[in-house]
Each structure stands twice: as C-alpha cells, then as structure tokens.
Amino acid sequence: MTSAIFLAMLCLGMALPSPAPDPILDVEWQKWKIKYGKAYSLEEEGQKRAVWEDNMKKIKLHNGENGLGKHGFTMEMNAFGDMTLEEFRKVMIEIPVPTVKKGKSVQKRLSVNLPKFINWKKRGYVTPVQTQGRCNSCWAFSVTGAIEGQMFRKTGQLIPLSVQNLVDCSRPQGNWGCYLGNTYLALHYVMENGGLESEATYPYEEKDGSCRYSPENSTANITGFEFVPKNEDALMNAVASIGPISVAIDARHASFLFYKRGIYYEPNCSSCVVTHSMLLVGYGFTGRESDGRKYWLVKNSMGTQWGNKGYMKISRDKGNHCGIATYALYPRV
C-alpha cells in the first residue's frame, strides 16, 4: 500500500484491515470469550482478536523474562484482554491530590516496634473483593473499604457499605460519579451527610443514578478523616496502628492491567501522578527480610479474577513506588 492510499484511508475514516489471526490461538481465543462473556460483531471480531493477540504476546514475553529473573511478578490474560493500552489510559484519569494545610495531616510518633507483617484481611477487617465494572468508581470502593475497617474495629461487625450511595450522592461535594471521583470528597460527603447506607439497602449498579439515600437506613458514619504524610514510614505506621488505609497509585501500565502475582515493580511508574484508588490492607516481605523483597498488600476493585484473587503486592521502600504514599487517608469513626 502506498503512503498516499494509507493517508487517504485515514482521512476518509476507513479502518485498516486487522492482521490475520494466529490459528494456533483459535481455541484459546474462544475459551477466553466464553469465560468473560464476550460477543462481537463481525467487524469488531477481527479488531478485538488482534488486540487480544498483541496483549497475549506481551504477557508471554513478560512471563518468559520473569522466569529468567528479570521481573518479580507474573502477568496473566484477564477480562481486559481486548483493550488497548490507550483505551485503558482514557479510563485511568489523573486524580487531583488535595493540598493539605500544615496541621491537617496526621503525624503520629513513628514506632520502632512495628510488626514485620500486617494483614487486616486475615483479622476480619476487610469485605470480599467486588467488581467496579463499567463504572469508574474505584474511589468509592476505596472509601467504603476504609470505613468498613474502622467500623469493624469499633463495633466488631463487618458490614459491606454502599458504593452506589457514594457514586450517586457525592456530586454536591465535587465528585463526578462513574466518570471521576476523589476519596477526599467522598469522605467529606459521608461526614456532612451524617451517614452511609449498606450494600444491602443501596446495592451497586455499575452506573450513575439519582441520590436515594435514606437516613433510616444509615449503617455507618464518620466523625472526620486524616491524611497520612506522603512517605512510606508514615504509611507503614498508619496501616499498622489504624487499619486499612485508602490509597491511590499510578496504574496506567499494561503490567498493572494484567498483573497476576508477585511483588509489582514497574520502572515507568510515577511517584507523583496517581490514577486509581485502592485499599491498603497490610505489608510484609518475602524470603528473608535482608533480601529486600518488601511489599504493600492492596485490595483492588476489578474482581477476583484480576491479580491474586483481587489483591496485589506493590514494592515497598522503593522510593514511594507508583505513588503508594502520595494520597493516603483514613476515616475517624
């Protein structure tokens, strides 16, 4: 094809033909579509198959290199296999990090006797992993998770709280529902509203809706919230002494999208820009402590088939890797 014809096709909005599919992957492609309920038009099929094959090649290349000791984690094909990185990054919008005035963040005296391992999930503070689906509601899952942990600490009862309540009702505070939200503004809503419903009375719908909060169904409330100073020592102190912490990371990478298990380290991660909210539920290390394979344990909201049953380990003490300590806060109840 000449360059002139190529340019003409672009100007006319014509799609270039997809590359021929690899017949060796036919069975795997069909199994993947069935597993994740994928169905395409004839036109879409070739395009999506090409994207899927490209992602599959990247995953196999990464895992091959991991077997040679180049990486510390594996990747796996999942429900996002038909997404290009460009499409994924359109969803991973940069989260504005509030400027915290002096005296507004918590700076407790750092303990020298912190536990070497913390896992609040094992202690009953964490509800099951959910799937945010088509709604960009990671911020709401992060906030409900942090409140659930503190309510369990206070009452001994672990009650799943309503993500949809936050999606529908925190617009007056500045959130944008399924388009974009901020954990700080979501906590402001709960505090100003005087309560938050449970998942049982206000279930998740994966879409924006009108606010239908009912005070009589309020299940949890907060008295305020605190920012954690932007360093990993303070974050370690907070998660050890307080419980699950709302955090955000830079998740704009294929390595994140197809993460499976191991300690995640992405050389291209930013320590300043964060795009995806998660729930920090612990920390630890693998092997011997002197080996330096330290990690943060975080809960995601992309379902149990993502990562290690919905969880991820992120490199700890590696220069605030992926911005794990850049935007951390927790509620007071």
From Swiss-Prot:
GO cellular component: lysosome
Subcellular location(s) per record: Lysosome
Active site: C138, H276, N300
Main location: other
Protein EC: 3.4.22.-
Tissue specificity as recorded in UniProt: Placenta.
Classification via InterPro entries: Papain-like_cys_pep_sf, Pept_his_AS, Peptidase_C1A, Peptidase_C1A_C, Peptidase_C1A_papain-like, Prot_inhib_I29
Positions of the propeptide segment: 16-113
Signal peptide: 1-15
Superkingdom per UniProt: Eukaryota
Disulfide bond positions: C135-C178, C169-C211, C269-C322
Glycosylation sites: N217, N221, N268
Any one GO MF annotation of this record: cysteine-type peptidase activity
GO biological process, one term: proteolysis
Gene3D superfamilies: Cysteine proteinases
Top enzyme class: hydrolase
PANTHER family: CYSTEINE PROTEASE FAMILY C1-RELATED
Protein family (similarity comment): Belongs to the peptidase C1 family.
Protein name: Cathepsin M
Organism: Mus musculus
